[in-house]
């Protein structure tokens, strides 16, 4: 009987995903059928985020609406800012993100609503608020005052602004935007499996993402 045990889930196929496909043998990564290389060249991160959530790239009106909703939800509550200020300065940013998303779940007015429509709205709020929380903690650990988000800036530009008080050259912003796109989705990896396991028990989206962050914490070395 012990021979049937798959250690560490090795060889276990849990499900399939249509969101992305990783093909290392040909150095290929696709999101919803679009090559990541093309998305990096022709799209911004906001468009790719919309693609992942909605299964297709947005038209002009859809993108404008999506960006407006994201920008309108960037600000954090006073309580969350207060919690960030009390966190140890040596805390790992992934741990900060995990805790911040957990608090967002406590505060979200739709926490108990797990309908597809509510989950979409909550996903956009998490997308909007998480960079604000990370940038705020970055400033706090350096002994600097928090810089609030600017609606006039896109996600990549705004993150630089909240961290450093200014937006760098376009080439640097583009490089960061490309990085956001390339790390946006990587098929049915461990963090996705973790989130799917949590949601299968009918937990809320904030709980699933909070737990999946514990896996991402272990993969920081990939960025380096």
Language model feature labels by segment:
Residues 215, 222-224:
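Single conserved hydrophobic/aromatic residue that forms the stacking wall/gate
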